[in-house]
A protein has these predicted regions:
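Charged interaction scaffolds used for protein-protein
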Residues: 1-4, 30-34, 38-39, 63-134
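Short, hydrophobic/amphipathic alpha-helical patches that form generic packing surfaces
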Residues: 47-58, 99-103
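Short N-terminal mixed-charge amphipathic segments
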Residues: 1-51
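Generic secondary-structure microfeatures
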Residues: 14-16, 56, 60
Length: 134
């Protein structure tokens, strides 16, 4: 996925290390299971900068790299993301950004094959249960 931030084009790619060490999957799952609209909006606003930062690690760690276990270093990079998003959101939509980032994570990362296999298993299980109850 390509994204232009402050006039510079970046490639977003969710690599294994950055995704796992920052516990992105749990945070995305929490977003998708929010109880109400206000809670979902709050979680989306909190997740956007971190999701963007993690997606930038694969190809742009020279500019946005950080040690996920060093809170001060991560917070410094998060501050950059907040500033970038302030500018980005003047002309773009937060919901679309989050949807595109999550789609990139699901469709074009190391997870995509695993997710497709899991969906296939689920469909087979449902089909078997449906057939068994007839």
């Amino acid at each position: 996925m390509k994204i232009t931030l402050n006039g510079t084009e970046y490639t977003i790619k969710f690599g294994y290390e950055a995704t796992v060490k920052n516990k992105i999957l749990k945070k995305v799952a929490d977003l998708e299971t929010s109880a109400d609209d206000l809670e979902a909006l709050d979680k989306m606003l909190m997740l956007a900068p971190e999701l963007l930062l993690v997606g930038l690690q694969k190809f742009h760690s020279d500019t946005f790299g950080f040690d996920p276990y060093n809170e001060a270093e991560k917070e410094q990079r998060m501050e950059q993301m907040y500033a970038i998003l302030d500018d980005y959101l003047e002309e773009n939509d937060m919901t679309s950004l989050i949807q595109n980032l999550i789609k990139e994570l699901e469709d074009n990362s190391f997870l995509s094959r695993m997710l497709r296999q899991e969906q296939s298993k689920t469909k087979k299980t449902v089909a078997m249960k449906t057939t068994a109850t007839k």
